[in-house]
A protein has these predicted regions:
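Residue-level signature of outer-membrane beta-barrel architecture
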Residues: 30-32, 74-76, 128-131, 167-169, ...
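Transmembrane beta-strand segments that form the barrel wall of outer-membrane beta-barrel proteins
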Residues: 42-46, 136-150, 175-179, 207, ...
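Residues that define the transmembrane beta-barrel architecture of outer-membrane proteins
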Residues: 34, 62-68, 119-123, 157-161, ...
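Outer-membrane beta-barrel "beta-signal"
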Residues: 207, 329, 370-376, 402-417
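Outer membrane beta-barrel
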Residues: 72-104, 113-192, 209-213, 293-295
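Outer-membrane beta-barrel translocator/channel fold
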Residues: 93, 173-196, 246-322, 326, ...
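Transmembrane beta-strand segments of Gram-negative outer membrane beta-barrel proteins
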Residues: 31-48, 79-87, 173
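Repeated loop/turn-to-beta-strand initiation elements of outer-membrane beta-barrel proteins
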Residues: 38, 79-83, 133-137, 172-176, ...
Length: 417
């Protein structure tokens, strides 16, 4: 595989599209169209964030917006080497906001005027090639990997430009490798050079694999390098143990080792991150406990436009500051057991301590989250998803801002074919 091709998806996409059209017109029996599918994902998102400290730059951030995401996924042309083409279109519309209420992450705003945009959008294409049980995708990507995870917590999902090869030739083994060159943030219409913080890089290379030894046990390893910024190793283990009496214990262990690379454009990177989650499950009940421990001189690094793959990634905070130790207690319940299918409840409390950030040497931050979600089960609004999210975030020793937050999210997916 030519690494230059992965780094230049914009140049390859027109050629791949022309190739796909030629292959399709030459083969009326091709599955390019018959195996295709399309859907529109609609999300209505309201956020009210009330800053609680007296010296806050804003008294509150409050925005309301409507998002549309259209996904078209083709099948593959016939033959040993199959070709396909996917398309992604995203549109965000402002329903309510203002310069003094900006900054929820729903809408982009002007750097000087601070005026939220009335709309923003993105169109992405992804060419794909399939050989046996291996697929190469080049173009617009939304990866879900430990070292590169796209963000989908606001109106529109973030995207990356690059190439991704996924192979499942061996039963139980999934191998991923690729290169990302640009990122489009969740509240942006433009692709920018990939980076971390204010530092930019030419590319992010990654490779790794996950192997399922059994339905109950899997092990993963990934490596990622953001050129001239940082290098990162990841090791993860997932295990589910039946305990009898309808109980099971799920263990999720993750370890990252992150160091600087080359010129270290983002400054010195030195971080070890061990995090774990243990969940006891019985019927509709799930009780979880986590522990996340960071060591080293820097915060845990992750790509702009992405999320950190950590167990204490919660509604508002990530708990990934330098030297931070954090724990979480969480409870989930599915009301289907009480004859109310579609209704679920989640509440959790997360506590982080010993933070080093700027002039703060022993900072603390806590967050309490509650989610209530209902999916309508029948009628004309069947499958409409309604979620209320409530957040209380507090910090100590001058670490950061305090806030109370409510989010109301309505989601619906319409299958076109």
């Amino acid at each position: 595989m030519n690494p230059v091709s992965i780094a230049s998806p914009k140049h390859l996409l027109p050629a791949m599209a022309s190739l796909g059209l030629g292959l399709f017109t030459c083969s009326v029996q091709a599955d390019f169209i018959s195996d295709s599918k399309a859907r529109i994902e609609m999300r209505n998102h309201y956020i009210n964030r009330d800053f609680r400290q007296a010296n806050a730059a804003q008294s509150k951030a409050e925005e309301w917006a409507q998002g549309f995401t259209a996904r078209i996924e083709s099948g593959y042309t016939e033959g040993t080497l199959g070709f396909g083409l996917d398309a992604l279109g995203e549109l965000g519309l402002k329903l309510d906001s203002s310069p003094d209420r900006r900054g929820t992450g729903l809408l982009p705003f002007g750097p000087n005027s601070h005026e939220p945009a009335d709309e923003f959008s993105e169109l992405g294409l992804t060419g794909k090639l399939r050989l046996s049980k291996s697929v190469l995708k080049i173009g617009t990507l939304q990866p879900l990997l430990p070292v590169a995870t796209y963000n989908d917590t606001r109106l529109l999902g973030s995207t990356f430009q690059g190439g991704l090869l996924t192979s499942q030739e061996i039963s139980g083994l999934t191998v991923n490798a690729g290169r990302l060159t640009e990122a489009n943030l969740r509240d942006s219409s433009s692709n920018d050079d990939i980076g971390y913080g204010a530092a930019r890089s030419d590319h992010f290379d990654f490779a790794g694999a996950s192997y399922a030894f059994s339905p109950q046990l899997s092990l993963s390893y990934y490596y990622g390098k953001l050129e001239q910024i940082y290098r990162q190793h990841y090791l993860g283990l997932l295990h589910t143990q039946p305990l009898g009496g309808g109980f099971s214990l799920r263990s999720d262990l993750r370890y990252f080792d992150s160091r600087g690379d080359g010129a270290e454009r983002a400054g010195r990177i030195d971080n070890r991150n061990f995090n774990s989650m243990f969940s006891l499950i019985k019927g509709p009940h799930k009780i979880s406990a986590t522990w996340q421990q960071l060591s080293g001189d820097s915060a845990f690094p992750f790509l702009n436009g992405g999320d950190p793959y950590v167990v204490n990634l919660v509604t508002y905070n990530t708990y990934t500051r330098a030297e931070e130790d954090s724990w979480q207690l969480r409870y989930d319940y599915d009301f289907a057991a009480m004859g109310l299918p579609g209704l679920t409840f989640m509440t959790r409390y997360t506590d982080g301590r010993h933070v080093k950030a700027g002039t703060v040497d022993n900072g603390r931050e806590t967050e309490r989250d509650t989610d209530i979600t209902y999916v309508i089960q029948s009628g004309p609004l069947k499958d409409l998803n309604i979620r209320w999210r409530n957040v209380t975030f507090r910090s100590g020793n001058g670490l950061t801002t305090d806030l109370d937050e409510n989010r109301l999210i309505l989601g619906y997916t319409l299958a076109l074919w």
